[in-house]
């Protein structure tokens, strides 16, 4: 069974239910993004948006990177009763293309409630937001204009 626990508000409840569904010889597999500073694909935009729309992410929503360290992930899984926990850390490069591609795809694929909040910004604030995001991408932008982000992923396996 493979699960991405960042989407569960009550991760312990979900993990315990998963554990109860596994055979005694079963293995759990989980992949999570690293901390936001190790996955700037997300943080470059999200940090900027939060400056313009403080309630962009609803209060009480789980942090996207709450399991983004080996220690946090290990603790969560161990607390749910799993054993023989192994976590591997991978960092790879990901390119969303040039800035306009990155920005347009973000706007295209965000959830409807978030898109509605962005659409409430007046045009001058939307332009300013886009400029802040563009500034955030500069450290990852090559001379040819292509953005290349590092992307950390933690992959965990654990036994029942």
Where are each of the predicted segments found?
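Non-membrane alpha-helical structural segments and their capping/turn regions in soluble enzymes
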Residues: 8, 12, 39, 123, ...
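Short conserved AdoMet
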Residues: 9, 23, 160
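Conserved Class I S-adenosyl-L-methionine
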Residues: 62-160
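A short SAM/SAH-binding and catalytic strip from SAM-dependent methyltransferases
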Residues: 1-12, 34
């Amino acid at each position: 069974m493979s699960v991405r626990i960042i989407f569960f508000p009550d991760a312990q409840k979900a993990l315990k239910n998963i554990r109860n569904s596994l055979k005694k010889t079963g293995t759990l597999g989980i992949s999570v993004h690293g901390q936001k500073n190790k996955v700037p694909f997300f943080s470059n935009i999200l940090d900027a948006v939060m400056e313009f729309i403080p309630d962009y992410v609803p209060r009480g929503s789980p942090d996207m990177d709450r399991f983004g360290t080996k220690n946090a992930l290990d603790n969560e899984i161990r607390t749910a009763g799993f054993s023989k926990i192994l976590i591997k850390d991978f960092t790879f490069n990901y390119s969303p293309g040039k800035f306009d591609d990155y920005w347009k795809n973000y706007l295209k694929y965000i959830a409807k409630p978030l898109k509605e909040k962005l659409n409430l910004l007046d045009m001058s604030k939307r332009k300013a937001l886009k400029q802040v995001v563009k500034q955030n991408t500069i450290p990852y932008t090559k001379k040819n204009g292509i953005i290349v982000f590092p992307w950390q992923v933690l992959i965990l396996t654990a036994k029942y």
